[in-house]
């Protein structure tokens, strides 16, 4: 778990015997805060995520999130630099030290372009989609599913490469549901941990005897692709208007026509947004299709036959 942390004078903290200077607050959620800190030993910037732990279960979940990070050494999954639990009287805070991405998230980029009246081009979308899919492939290969994939949980590296973050909702990929009590428990868990407008249909009304697998991530990936194509998720407006997302996701998605997108990309999106999870493709199938669709590298020329 790393060494204990101490908050020192002049806004510095010590993590694993290294001192970090507080720079500014980056954001906050319901029970967590993210600060920008500078490593005084190397001059690099980091994101320090502080999770408030009110109960023992909160500590266990924070530690599990750290363990999920440590499972992966992958260019499309966020690395954990250090983890520790800080005690402050009867209260605890779990601290995760993470790399800082100055480009922000995929959603920041979508919003930036939308403010200019434009969208990501297909040649920009395809490499992003490939990187996100490779990150998911690595997660699924370890027997897990992300369960909360959305544009705000995808960071952009210096070269624009996508990096999956927020692994706190990850759980086993394949869940065998046996009985109404287990179904309701999973449904309640999803309502708390899986963002509503990116949540797969099978998680809104979990059947008493069924299998929920990693293809919930494929649905969410389809929603992310839609957001890259059209500047907002397919169910964002449904949620914002107060209409039922649970009802909306049970119907086949209507994909707007646009000259910006090829029929191949539209077909790929349509396959991801298949309501029946058993008919939805697995990530390796999508990857093989995506690799064939990738634009040529700069300086490369394709020959038309």
UniProtKB/Swiss-Prot annotation:
GO terms for cellular component: cytosol; Golgi apparatus; Golgi-associated vesicle; nuclear body; perinuclear region of cytoplasm; plasma membrane. InterPro entries: Kinase-like_dom_sf, Prot_kinase_dom, Ser/Thr-specific_kinases, Ser/Thr_kinase_AS. It holds the Pfam family Pkinase. GO terms for biological process: cellular response to transforming growth factor beta stimulus; positive regulation of transcription by RNA polymerase II; protein autophosphorylation; protein phosphorylation. Residues 166-202 are annotated as: Activation loop. Its main location: cytoplasm. A lipid is attached at residue 2 (N-myristoyl glycine). Keywords: ATP-binding, Cytoplasm, Kinase, Lipoprotein, Membrane, Myristate, Nucleotide-binding, Palmitate, Phosphoprotein, Serine/threonine-protein kinase, Transferase. GO terms for molecular function: ATP binding; non-membrane spanning protein tyrosine kinase activity; protein serine kinase activity; protein serine/threonine kinase activity; RNA polymerase II cis-regulatory region sequence-specific DNA binding. It catalyses: L-seryl-[protein] + ATP = O-phospho-L-seryl-[protein] + ADP + H(+); L-threonyl-[protein] + ATP = O-phospho-L-threonyl-[protein] + ADP + H(+); L-tyrosyl-[protein] + ATP = O-phospho-L-tyrosyl-[protein] + ADP + H(+). Mainly autophosphorylated on serine/threonine residues. Also autophosphorylated on Tyr-198. Its EC number is 2.7.11.1, 2.7.10.2. The active site is at 148 (proton acceptor). Residues 20-293 form the Protein kinase domain. Ubiquitously expressed at low levels. Relatively higher levels in testis, kidney and liver. A lipid is attached at residues 6, 8 (S-palmitoyl cysteine). Belongs to the protein kinase superfamily. Ser/Thr protein kinase family. PANTHER family: SERINE/THREONINE-PROTEIN KINASE 16 (PTHR45998), SERINE_THREONINE-PROTEIN KINASE 16 (PTHR45998:SF2). Membrane-associated protein kinase that phosphorylates on serine and threonine residues. In vitro substrates include DRG1, ENO1 and EIF4EBP1. Also autophosphorylates. May be involved in secretory vesicle trafficking or intracellular signaling. May have a role in regulating stromal-epithelial interactions that occur during ductal morphogenesis in the mammary gland. May be involved in TGF-beta signaling. Able to autophosphorylate on Tyr residue; it is however unclear whether it has tyrosine-protein kinase toward other proteins. Monomer. Interacts with DRG1 (via its N-terminal); the interaction phosphorylates DRG1. This is Serine/threonine-protein kinase 16. It comes from Mus musculus (Mouse). The gene is Stk16.
């Amino acid at each position: 778990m790393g060494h204990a942390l101490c908050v020192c004078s002049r806004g510095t903290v010590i993590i694993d015997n290294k001192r970090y200077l507080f720079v500014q607050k980056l954001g906050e959620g319901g029970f967590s805060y993210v600060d920008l800190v500078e490593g005084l030993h190397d001059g690099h910037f980091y994101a320090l995520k502080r999770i408030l732990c009110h109960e023992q279960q909160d500590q266990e979940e924070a530690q599990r999130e750290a363990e999920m990070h440590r499972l992966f050494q992958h260019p499309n999954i966020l690395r954990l630099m250090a983890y520790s639990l800080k005690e402050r009287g009867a209260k605890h805070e779990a601290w995760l030290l993470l790399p800082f991405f100055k480009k922000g998230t995929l959603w920041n980029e979508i919003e930036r372009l939308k403010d200019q009246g434009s969208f990501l081009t297909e040649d920009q979308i395809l490499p992003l989609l490939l990187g996100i899919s490779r990150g998911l492939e690595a997660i699924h290969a370890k027997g897990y599913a992300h369960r909360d994939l959305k544009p705000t949980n995808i960071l952009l590296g210096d070269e624009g490469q996508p990096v999956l973050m927020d692994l706190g909702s990850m759980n086993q990929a394949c869940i065998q549901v046996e009985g109404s009590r287990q179904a309701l428990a999973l449904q309640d868990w999803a309502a708390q941990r899986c963002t509503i407008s990116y949540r797969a249909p099978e998680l809104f009304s979990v059947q008493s005897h069924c299998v929920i697998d990693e293809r919930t991530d494929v649905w969410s990936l389809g929603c992310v692709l839609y957001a890259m194509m059209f500047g907002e998720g397919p169910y964002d407006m449904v949620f914002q208007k107060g209409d039922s997302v649970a009802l909306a996701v049970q119907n086949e998605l209507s994909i707007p026509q646009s000259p910006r997108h090829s029929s191949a990309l539209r077909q790929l999106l349509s396959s991801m947004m298949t309501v029946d999870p058993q008919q939805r493709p697995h990530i390796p199938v999508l990857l093989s299709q995506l690799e064939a669709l990738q634009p040529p590298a700069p300086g490369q020329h394709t020959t038309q036959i």
